[in-house]
Structure formats: C-alpha cells, structure tokens
C-alpha cells in the first residue's frame, strides 16, 4: 500500500510460541522475543514487542581461535556470509579494522576466519567488527496487518492472541464437523436397524410395489412410528444408551436403505450393531464435553504440538544486553594529522605541512591558542581553526 505500511514480523521460536499460547489461554502474562535460524545474539532492550518504532540489535557470534585469528560462526539474521565478508572488507579498506586476511571456510556451518595484522589486539578488533561492519546490525520491526479491511499496527503479542483465538475457532469447527458425521452415522445405523429388525424388506407391499415411488412411500410409512421414539442399545447387559433421530427422514435416506445388499441383511448381528451405536454415542458425548471446554482443548493442542515437534526447534539466538561500543576507541588510527600554523589550517590533507600525530577519521581534535582559549572540532581533510595556534592533539 505504502512504504510505511510494509510489514516486518521477525521469526520466533516454535516452543516459546506454544508456551505463550498456553499462557494466554490460561490468562497469564507472556513475553516472546525473536529467534533466528542463523543464530547470533540479540539485545531486546528497545524491541518494544515488535511494534513500529522498536529496534532490535543483532550481533554475529565471534570467538577467538587464537591470538592472531578471530572466527565468526553465526551471522546476523538477513545477512549472508558473502554480504558479511563484503562489509568487513570495506571496513578494512577504509582502515577502520586492521586485518591481514579474511577467509571463508563455510561448509555445513558458518565459519569465517579473520586473520589479524601483526600487533593488533583481538579484543579491540572484535569490537571494531561490531562497530564498523555488519557483524552488528539494527532491525526495525513493523507489525502492520490488515484488520477489518484497514491497516493497523499491532505488537507480536497481539498477533499471537489473534492466532490462538483463530486456532480455537478451527478446532471448534473440526469438532462440529466430526459431530455431524457421527450423528449421520448414528442416524443411518438406526434406520438400518429398524429396516432389518422390523423385516420391512419382507413385507408383501414392499415386494409387490410396482415403482420406486411406491417402495419409498411404503418404507416411509413403516418408519413413521419410530420418528419420536427413544431407541435403546445394550451390549452384554453392560453398556446402555438411549438415542433418537436428530433430523427428518428424507427420500435420499430411504433410497440408501434400498441399496443394502441381501447378503449384508442375512449377516446382520444385533449385538454388533448395538456395539457400534454405543461407540458412536460415546464419541459424541466426548465431543460434546470438548465443545463445552474449548479452552482446555486448545491448551492440549498446543502442548501436543510442542511435545511432537519441539525437540527439533531449540532456541538458536542468545538474548543478552550488549555493551555500548565507543567507535572512537576501537577505530584504528588510519590517518595522519597535519597543521599549517602560518595560515591557521589543520587536517589530514595537508601532507606538505607539519605532522602532528596519527588519528582516525572519527576522532575529535583539540586546538589550544596562545591567548589561553581552546577549540574542539572534528578531523577533516582541511579545516580553518584560526592563527596563533599553541598546540594541537587528538581529543
């Protein structure tokens, strides 16, 4: 619809979603956080439950292989090994990270080796990778959905609640569908029982009927007395159930009775028929109980899903608080600062003038004047700071 209405809902952990669904159904509070198949780590301090305006910090997993090598084994969500290596390479080319070589030895699992330049601190380089490459990225979720034909912004918890309510509705529909099937089965089994036990098929009028319409009318008349009657099914003197027709008898029902073959009629067993009716009625009672306790049914459903599939979906992304990295402390001094005292200029581009010190393009510099005043400014290629300079250094 529009750029601001694009939806970005991040993946979450299967087990945690099942647990959250159960908590919601029980009326308990719950919190869910993203979980990525690529692993890594996340800082959820500003996630804001996935709502628009929130920010999720995502980091790669970097370990020390030895004093001269760092290894990246998990990458941020939405990044590939290729795009991650490209971002590191660009940072190296700009002098922000000191690395001798970047090697991709990924096979079944991610493995990117960062070989450090001689004399480089591995801890400082690790922080620099987070600060200047895609080893750390920010993802801005935007849970925009269509509700009542209008776009609206929800939290992921809201989406979960809607989803759980919909699941309950689907489970109810499944139970109602099965109930209808069983009622039809019970209905026709009862018709069949009457048709055979009352020997309607042996009646003279049945045998002498000249048309199908006459047969149908005759059978309908014989079934009429049973319409409002309670039937009883008993097996071995133990199980007992009473039931009645749940709907009117139609022409199609009678035509279906006429399709019963004589061999089946001859093999008809009343005890087996009663046993079937008892089983149907027992399942119907169970369904009625489930329909009256849909919350418990839905809880059992999510617990079943977790038990069956949960082991295959462990959490892969670690949740923790990230330390703030000050980029000026981890960036390499990749520039040289010069000063032209006579004209009052300082900068990295004044290569013919007086060398002050090494610096990075992210540093601030402080300039002291002979009258006791001072000035702080950013490193630039060439910037006028004024004459009567006493001293200049990185701030």
Segments from the language model and where they lie:
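C-terminal interaction appendages of subunits in large macromolecular complexes
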Residues: 1-395
């Amino acid at each position: 619809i529009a750029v601001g209405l694009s939806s970005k809902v991040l993946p979450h952990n299967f087990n945690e979603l099942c647990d959250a669904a159960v908590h919601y159904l029980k009326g308990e509070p719950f919190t869910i956080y993203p979980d990525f198949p690529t692993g890594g780590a996340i800082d959820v301090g500003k996630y804001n439950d996935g709502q628009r305006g929130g920010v999720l910090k995502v980091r790669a997993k970097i370990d020390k292989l030895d004093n001269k090598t760092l290894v990246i084994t998990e990458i941020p969500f939405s990044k590939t090994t290729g795009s991650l290596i490209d971002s590191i390479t660009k940072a190296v080319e700009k002098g922000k990270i000191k690395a001798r070589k970047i090697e991709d030895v990924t096979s079944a699992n991610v493995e990117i080796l960062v070989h450090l330049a001689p004399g480089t601190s591995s801890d400082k380089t690790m922080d620099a990778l987070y600060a200047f490459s895609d080893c750390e990225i920010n993802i801005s979720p935007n849970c925009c959905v269509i509700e009542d034909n209008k776009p609206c912004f929800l939290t992921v918890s809201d989406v979960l609640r809607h989803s759980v309510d919909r699941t309950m509705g689907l489970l109810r529909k499944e139970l109602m569908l099965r109930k209808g099937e069983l009622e039809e089965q019970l209905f026709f089994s009862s018709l069949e029982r009457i048709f055979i036990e009352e020997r309607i098929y042996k009646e003279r009028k049945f045998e002498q009927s000249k048309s199908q319409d006459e047969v149908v009318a005759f059978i309908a008349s014989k079934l009429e007395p049973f319409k409002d009657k309670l039937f009883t099914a008993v097996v071995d003197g133990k199980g007992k159930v009473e039931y009645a027709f749940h709907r009117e008898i139609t022409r199609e029902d009678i035509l279906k009775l006429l399709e019963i073959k004589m061999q089946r009629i001859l093999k008809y067993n009343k005890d087996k028929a009663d046993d079937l009716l008892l089983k149907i009625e027992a399942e119907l009672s169970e369904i009625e109980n489930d329909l009256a306790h849909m919350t418990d049914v839905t809880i059992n459903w999510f617990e079943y899903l977790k038990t069956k599939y949960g082991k295959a979906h462990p959490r892969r992304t670690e949740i923790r608080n990230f330390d703030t990295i000050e980029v000026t402390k981890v960036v390499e001094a990749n520039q040289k600062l010069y000063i032209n005292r006579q004209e009052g200029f300082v900068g990295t581009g004044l290569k013919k003038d007086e060398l002050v010190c090494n610096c990075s393009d992210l540093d601030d510099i402080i300039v002291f004047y002979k009258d006791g005043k001072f000035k702080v400014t950013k490193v630039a290629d060439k910037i006028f700071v004024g004459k009567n300079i006493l001293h200049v250094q990185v701030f």
